[in-house]
Amino acid sequence: WDYRQEDPVNDARGTRLERAAAHPDLLTDAPQLNITNVIAPNGGRIYVDHAHPEYSAPETTDPFEAVRYDRAGDLIMRAAAAKASETTGRKIVLHRNNVDGKGASWGTHENYMMLRSVPFDLVTRLMTTHFVSRQIFIGSGRVGIGEHSENAGYQLSQRADYFHMKVGLQTTFDRPIINTRDESHSTDEYLSLIHI
C-alpha cells in the first residue's frame, strides 16, 4: 500500500489539523511494518486494521456491482481462512461483524467520490439522515446495547453506540457519522471523497 497518498490531517471542510495536536490514532499515514496488506484478486484490498482482518472492495459506480464485490469479499476471506486452517492445522473461523461488545469497533466504511465544488456542509446536511435511517431497512443488528454491551437488548445497527458526533476528522475515537478527512486518492483535483 502506498502511504504517500495518505493525509489524515487534511480536513474536507478546508482546514488542516496540526500534526502535533493530532491524537496518535489519527496519524494513519505512517507505514506499518509486518502488517498483512495485499491487493485481492478482484482489485480489492485485504489488510489488518487494529488486529482485525479487513476487506476493502474495489471502486465501482454500479450499486449491483458493489453488492457483488461485497459478496466476493466474503468468499475471498472464507478461502483465506480455509487456507490458514490447512496451513496451521488449527481451525480458523471468521465472523462478519464490526463490534466486539467490549468497547471496540472496526471496519464497515463507505467512500463516495463527489465534486469538490459541492459544499461539504450541504452534503452532510442532506445525507446524514439517510445514513442514519437506512439502518431500519438494512442494518445487520446486534445483541447488546452500549459500547460494552452493558445492557440487554437488540439493536438494528451494530455501530450506533460508537458514533459520538455528526461530522469530524477522527476515525478511531469520538467517531463521526461522516468523516471529513480529505483523501480522495484521485489524480483529479476537482474530486473529493466523502468517507462514511
Where do the protein language model's features map onto the residues?
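Histidine-centered divalent-metal-coordination microenvironment in nucleic-acid enzymes
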Residues: 98-99, 103-115
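Long intrinsically disordered, low-complexity regulatory regions enriched in proline and serine/threonine
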Residues: 154-157, 164
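Short, conserved charged micro-motifs
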Residues: 118-123
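Beta-sheet entry/capping signal
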Residues: 91-93, 109-111, 153
